[in-house]
Amino acid sequence: PNKSPAFDPQWKENGHMDKVLHLAKEWVEKFRPENSTLHIKEVENRTPIMLLEIPGDRDGNILMYGHLDKQPEMEGWNDELGPWKPVMKDEKLYGRGVADDGYALFASVGSILALKDQGVSLPRIVVLIEFCEESGSPDLPFYMSECNSIIGEVDLVICLDSGAGNYDQFWTTVS
């Protein structure tokens, strides 16, 4: 369970975050767009950050944001369901983190690949994935400064982190 540092003070020793980072890195390396560059930053006493830099063929610079840390499992799970083992039931996926914005990396890369497959001209895009959002993102300001040369001057931020009113439809939030 890749719990955020506020909920797992021994996150580094427990190794769950490193495992998730490794799995995410493997997935990105397999599916990332052509000519993209993957950056992984790890600084002592800070959670890691992942940036996928995708060159564009038109003006503009988009930052797509998401996270891969989780809140605690809480209580109230049905007997056949549990927080740490995903289960498909009635065409729905159950498990801790399934609807907790863990999709951001995959949705970002998937949407970029789909647009590229359709021949859509895209600006430069940087996908930024952090690992301490559920703890209030204490490491994000440091990395935003540290990685400024990768992130660049941003024209649009797409934040893949929100809520849902029910499980019957897709929800979008604009702020």
Where are these regions (language model features)?
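Tryptophan-centered motif/residue detector
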Residues: 7-11, 27, 65, 77-80, ...
